[in-house]
Amino acid sequence: MNALHTLTTLQEAVDWLRQRVTGTLQTDSRLIQPGDGFIAWPGAATDGRAHVGDAVARGAAACLVECEGVEPFALAGDHIAALRGLKAATGMIASEWFGHPTQRLQVLAVTGTNGKTSTAWWLADALNQLSKEELPALAGCALVGTLGMGVPPALQTTGMTTPDPVRLQRAFAQFAEAGHRACAIEASSIGLAEHRLDGTRIHVALFTNFTQDHLDYHPGMAAYWQAKRALFDWPGLRAAVVNVDDPQGAALHAELQGSDLDLWSISLQGPARLQAKHIVHTGAGLALTVAEGAHTEVLQTQVIGLYNVSNLLGVIAGMRALGVPLAQALQACARLRPVPGRMEQLAAAGQPLVAVDYAHTPDALHQALAALKPVAAQRGGRLWCVFGCGGNRDAGKRPLMGAVAQREADEVIVTSDNPRGEEPQSIIHQILLGTIAGTSVRAEVDRAAAIAQALAEAGANDVVLIAGKGHEDYQEAAGQRVPFSDMAHARAALARRGGVA
């Protein structure tokens, strides 16, 4: 370590970078342009420090690396420095580098096992509608999440729910410079645990729900919860929106009472600061009454599923926390359409109804099937479920999802999702361990064939849920991604039946 300059404070690191970097900061050596700074730490799949040579060859003016365990990389030179705890400090460094961009944005951060994507997308969509029409002072809302970064629907894919802190702070700066005044972001438990949001000023934190997921990353449910819970102790947080129908949410709400936060409880089941009542299915979607104290308004939505009512309440409460009047918040929500890959439907006369949804946890699959059950009953048809589970992810949920599918659907085809590095048949076997052998559950390892099979056999009045991949346009197996879209395969299968979707 004698030849490697060691920094001791965050400010020292920022100053060191400013003295050398004339471009921007990057955490991916392949994106380096001459004059850029490269930040490298050990990751889950690769160690960024192994790519310092590549970064330098591409013109990096400075490389800031994690100090701990750096010796094997034999790094040296005036353009390389080390900082202990770099990964956790990068968010603060990036925020400082890009001029603290979230001081110019109202950031709404959504956390929870399910519902983050829909809630964040709808927040951005609703606020953008209002900024164009009723409330131009809002000046628009950007989005960061599973579907990408930007202003919906024009998003740049990142491959992560919560991007790395350098990419995130750069995006915030670009949003602020473009004149946007708000940003809705999905705050994943992994993103929070890895400090990707550090350095971000958050105005409103929203909690959707808490069920099993990501136990391939977190050592247990307690650690998974603590990662999400940290969002509600965020420095400078002004408001919190909490779904109290969720037991963990009810406990969180109780903990937050008496704090300085503008606290919004939301509920479909009982008293709350914002409550949904008189929920009914209509031809257009769910209709309901929204009550805030004694003030009530009727909302006709274009979505189905009680979980989506909960998501919409979160959107309304988030807007209310920003000062949007209730009536205008509801006007915007009435115009919201399903999010890509989230209960996205294909409908054609005389053909089964298809719903493509990202549901990839036991609770999300239950909620999706529960939402479609009354639709199938209304049509006088059966409910089908085509799904699989991702490889190299929480394996404990596989039999649970098998049990949910068999319990809720009339016909189940278990297939491949993104097998990644696992054997597809092995994943399917683990899913089937949660089912009882019978004629209602079968397996087809080829996802395209499974979708085709379901839509060839389904009756015209049936409803077919294709779950797990949602918006994704690829399938990942054995280290390769090949083009694959559930929606495209469903359209093709309907076309073979003679239906136009």
From Swiss-Prot:
Its main location: cytoplasm. It is an enzyme of class 6 (ligase). Meso-2,6-diaminopimelate binds at R393, D417, N418, P419, R420, G468, E472. It holds the Pfam family Mur_ligase_C. A motif (Meso-diaminopimelate recognition motif) lies at residues 417-420. InterPro entries: Mur-like_cat_sf, Mur_ligase_C, Mur_ligase_C_dom_sf, Mur_ligase_cen, MurE/MurF_N, UDP-N-AcMur-Glu-dNH2Pim_ligase. UDP-N-acetyl-alpha-D-muramoyl-L-alanyl-D-glutamate binds at S29, T161, T162, S188, R196. One of its GO terms (cellular component) is cytoplasm. Its cofactor is Mg(2+). The keyword Nucleotide-binding applies. ATP binds at G112, T113, N114, G115, K116, T117, S118. GO terms for molecular function: ATP binding; magnesium ion binding; UDP-N-acetylmuramoylalanyl-D-glutamate-2,6-diaminopimelate ligase activity. It catalyses: UDP-N-acetyl-alpha-D-muramoyl-L-alanyl-D-glutamate + meso-2,6-diaminopimelate + ATP = UDP-N-acetyl-alpha-D-muramoyl-L-alanyl-gamma-D-glutamyl-meso-2,6-diaminopimelate + ADP + phosphate + H(+). PANTHER family: MUR LIGASE FAMILY MEMBER, UDP-N-ACETYLMURAMOYL-L-ALANYL-D-GLUTAMATE--2,6-DIAMINOPIMELATE LIGASE MURE HOMOLOG, CHLOROPLASTIC. This is UDP-N-acetylmuramoyl-L-alanyl-D-glutamate--2,6-diaminopimelate ligase.
